[in-house]
């Protein structure tokens, strides 16, 4: 007769959870940030609001974004004029698009990750799907399982309405799943499209306009597992993961799903709330490792917007190159909510390899991944990079 303890021991993995592959995807429709204000005010029939347009132009100019990808094309917006008003009942039409397109974009990212992983998809044991775009039953996790042709016994977790911190959350959950289930291979997918948040401008709600200047569409997928086989190629190890609520930050970032879609509300002091609380998170994460020099680790921070990055950089005395990968993704894609940090992970390992650096983390051993979002919630993940083997010359 076996004991519970013996069963439990056999269930656990030996080593730490490891990122084994990363894939990303965006819609085909690309919008240029410099010309976006003209397009946005034209398509929303708001060209007469000249002062507001000038404000929006300044927001876009200061956003540090070059381009974004959006499922919503001019054609779709003309077919759905209610999306272009500030507060028109439009949830049904938004849902009809999101429920189909969110898993579809997620599938593209997942296929890319599975291809890099190089293992049969039948080895995927768990699926974690995260989106702030469109709620349904059965959810996007179910749709993705069907689209990819995964086994019916795959164990699914669906995360709706988490927001911008959730790229950290999915890694935290994948770590626990991989380390507590021997042989588990967890497919995590963050898929975000702005169809639920797009709306026309309002003079009285400039925080809504901030979102229109920043948000973009994208999906990222990561495969996580412990004890990699010789055929698998580890990219990063997940060492620890924490979540905390910043004190006195209630209402800093809110989102409400209404008949008019998903409305976002931001307080002006979000950058200072993040920058004032980030060092405590760093200390708690890295003190056990004996690390206190924040320039000695590689950085993957959710790029909520340029002001957050600037204040974090300033508060911690970070060298400008520390946030290079983060700023690159913000510039090339905008704020894709939960998917952003996974895009940054992808950018970092690729740039590290291309530059001939020794590790996947810009040549450094230890790194940190931050998610910031509604709550104000901060996710902190400690990463350990992997040595890059020199390719054949």
UniProtKB/Swiss-Prot annotation:
The keyword Acyltransferase applies. Its EC number is 2.3.1.74. One of its GO terms (biological process) is polyketide biosynthetic process. It comes from the Eukaryota. GO terms for molecular function: naringenin-chalcone synthase activity. Keywords: Acyltransferase, Flavonoid biosynthesis, Transferase. The primary product of this enzyme is 4,2',4',6'-tetrahydroxychalcone (also termed naringenin-chalcone or chalcone) which can under specific conditions spontaneously isomerize into naringenin. This is Chalcone synthase DII. It comes from Ipomoea batatas.
């Amino acid at each position: 007769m076996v004991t519970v303890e013996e069963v439990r021991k056999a269930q656990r993995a030996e080593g730490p959870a490891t990122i084994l592959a990363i894939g990303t995807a965006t819609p085909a429709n690309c919008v240029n940030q410099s010309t976006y204000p003209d397009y946005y005010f034209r398509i929303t029939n708001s060209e007469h609001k000249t002062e507001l347009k000038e404000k929006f132009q300044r927001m876009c100019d200061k956003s540090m974004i070059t381009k974004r990808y959006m499922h919503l094309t001019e054609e779709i917006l003309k077919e759905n004029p209610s999306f272009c008003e500030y507060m028109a009942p439009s949830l049904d039409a938004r849902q009809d698009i999101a429920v189909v397109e969110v898993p579809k974009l997620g599938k593209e990212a997942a296929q890319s990750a599975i291809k890099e992983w190089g293992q049969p998809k039948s080895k995927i044991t768990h699926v974690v799907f995260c989106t702030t775009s469109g709620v349904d039953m059965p959810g996007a996790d179910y749709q993705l399982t069907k689209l990819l042709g995964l086994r019916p016994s795959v164990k699914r977790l669906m995360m709706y309405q988490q927001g911008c911190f959730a790229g950290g959350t999915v890694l935290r959950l994948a770590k626990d799943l991989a380390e507590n289930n021997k042989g588990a291979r967890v497919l995590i997918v963050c898929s975000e499209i702005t169809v639920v948040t797009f709306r026309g401008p309002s003079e009285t709600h400039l925080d809504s306009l901030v979102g229109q200047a920043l948000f973009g569409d994208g999906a990222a997928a990561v495969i996580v597992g412990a004890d990699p086989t010789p055929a698998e190629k580890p990219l990063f190890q997940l060492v620890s993961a924490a979540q905390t609520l910043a004190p006195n930050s209630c209402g800093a970032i809110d989102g409400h799903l209404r008949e008019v879609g998903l409305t976002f509300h931001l307080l002006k002091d979000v950058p200072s709330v993040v920058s004032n609380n980030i060092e405590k998170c760093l200390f708690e994460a890295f003190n056990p490792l004996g690390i206190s020099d924040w320039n000695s680790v590689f950085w993957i921070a959710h790029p909520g917007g340029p002001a957050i990055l600037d204040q974090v950089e300033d508060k911690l005395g970070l060298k400008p190159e520390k946030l290079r990968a983060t700023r690159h993704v913000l510039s090339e894609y905008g704020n894709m909510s939960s998917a952003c940090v996974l895009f940054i992970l992808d950018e970092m390992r690729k740039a590290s390899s291309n530059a001939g650096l020794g590790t996947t983390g810009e040549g450094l051993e230890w790194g940190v991944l931050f998610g910031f979002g509604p709550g104000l919630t901060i996710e902190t993940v400690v990463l350990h990079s992997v040595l890059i083997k020199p390719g054949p010359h």
